[in-house]
């Protein structure tokens, strides 16, 4: 376990929310001209958390606690979470890297660090770390989901689907897992299976706007723009939905449209 970890260490419901969803969908389609990256990345459409003065104060308070005892794993996790809430994802990953080096057998730390590597785009390193964050005898569905996201970002869709399917055996019908699996099917050019899986995800009680937006995206890729717009209107205004459908039309017309999809997926809970 230390070998892989050392190698990684050395290779370094408001209007506002609806508007944010519209922007995020455009970003996911590759048409918004922004570099928004979603958490866990395990992908598509998600908000990063509060960027309020309270969030900054919490980060500053936790920074003091962390600097006083950087070996405390739980403080490191809390501090990294606060950094993420203020969009300091690279710093959060660095904090978790140091915590992992100090606590190489702490699977909670390794899991958090591995997920942070996915978030900052270090997918191959993430796979190395996440492999040590749980065991076949005691698998964690959230870690499996993150492994799936990393694999999907690397274009390894068959492997990604295997991780998502394994996670679903532990957490049946989890909407974020189903949505991520559906995105992977879409990236594999299997749009019918993608739609079937996305609809199952959207039908779950815990499904949120991100899951429904992913379903709308797949429907748009299949040319079913009216259906896509009807789904988007559940979470945004008619004008916003129409704008996003217009972007879907542009995406569907591109020869390489599937390459514009967000490979990471929807972040799992917890």
Label each region the model flagged.
Residues 3, 25-26, 30-78, 82-86, ...:
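N-terminal leader/linker segments that initiate helical-solenoid repeat arrays
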Residues 39-40, 205, 209-270:
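Terminal, low-structured helical/coil segments at or just beyond the last alpha-helical repeat
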Residues 68-69, 102-103, 133-137, 170, ...:
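Structural marker of alpha-solenoid helical repeat scaffolds
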